[in-house]
């Protein structure tokens, strides 16, 4: 199946979160999103932030790209220390290390969800599709 067909087949919802906390900037909005793969009925619910005044509300394509990107960050690192070093958390003191560990764990959860939702062939097709997104 092509990436376009996979993306088209996914069910997607994005709802503005009741509680707007830990935002990237005051202009960002936190959404609760869900992607469902109808091929296996597996789903993933996740938080997503964007600045709708600068771009637009979340789309299935944008959210899926971010999920795949986060998953690849975790998959490309051998362990927590590698992640902290690769993404610059190691040099910022204890607070930065804590933030980095939180980010690493979130990326690992996302990678596990992507592995659960999609087959290897689907992941390959999607990663190729988003290569230059």
What are these regions (language model features)?
Residues 23-30, 36-118:
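Acidic, low-complexity, intrinsically disordered interaction modules
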Residues 130-133:
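Short acidic DE-rich linear segments
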Residues 20, 66, 126-127:
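A structural signal for short hydrophobic/aromatic patches embedded in well-ordered alpha helices
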Residues 2-20:
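Negatively charged, low-complexity tracts enriched in Asp/Glu with abundant Ser/Thr
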Residues 1-4, 31-34:
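Intrinsically disordered, low-complexity boundary segments flanking structured domains
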């Amino acid at each position: 199946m092509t990436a376009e067909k996979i993306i088209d087949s996914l069910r997607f919802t994005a709802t503005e979160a009741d509680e707007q906390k830990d935002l990237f900037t005051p202009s960002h909005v936190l959404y609760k999103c869900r992607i469902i793969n109808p091929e296996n009925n597996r789903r993933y619910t996740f938080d997503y932030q964007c600045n709708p005044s600068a771009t637009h509300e979340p789309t299935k394509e944008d959210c899926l790209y971010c999920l795949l990107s986060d998953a690849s960050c975790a998959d490309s690192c051998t362990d927590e220390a590698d992640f902290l070093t690769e993404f610059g958390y190691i040099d910022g003191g204890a607070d930065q290390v804590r933030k980095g560990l939180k980010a690493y764990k979130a990326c690992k959860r996302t990678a596990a969800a992507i592995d659960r939702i999609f087959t290897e062939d689907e992941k390959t097709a999607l990663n190729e599709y988003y290569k230059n997104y």
